[in-house]
Amino acid sequence: MKFDYIIGNPPYADGKGVKNLHLECVNYCVGMFNNKMVIVMPITFLKQSNTKINKFKKTFDSSLVEVTEYKSTIFEGTTMPNIGVYVFDKSKKADDKINIHYLGKHTLSLSSLLDGIYDKTTNDILSYLETSKDYSKHIYSS
């Protein structure tokens, strides 16, 4: 079965100890949409790296075009990390970049999620630079 569009907020765990259920769901859906898919899931996925996570990243690279970070407070009463709105597009070309818009002003454009998302230290530095008068004017904002 194929869908023109998929919009989803997949479950994150199954209650039986299975983690990253949302990644399994999104991975399955990547093969089921014809045009676009918009998924809400934790932004922390981008910073994780292991064999299983990298398998998902490689699959997502084929159609992921944009990720925008939002504070998790949009879901009242949650204690989860910030969330990302992930936009997938089947018309993505091989040389199209993946644009990742983090809270604040910094944006990354990557060829692949496997290129590496910066670590906590880099994030702390960028956050500092965004708030410092002397440096904030030099940070790219989309």
Residue ranges of predicted features:
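Local beta-strand N-terminus motif with an aromatic residue
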Residues: 2-3, 34
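Hydrophobic beta-strand segment of the Class I
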Residues: 6-7
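Non-catalytic DNA-recognition/assembly elements of restriction-modification systems
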Residues: 10-12
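C-terminal substrate-recognition regions of SAM-dependent nucleic acid methyltransferases
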Residues: 72-142
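Conserved Class I SAM-dependent methyltransferase catalytic core
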Residues: 14-74, 78-88
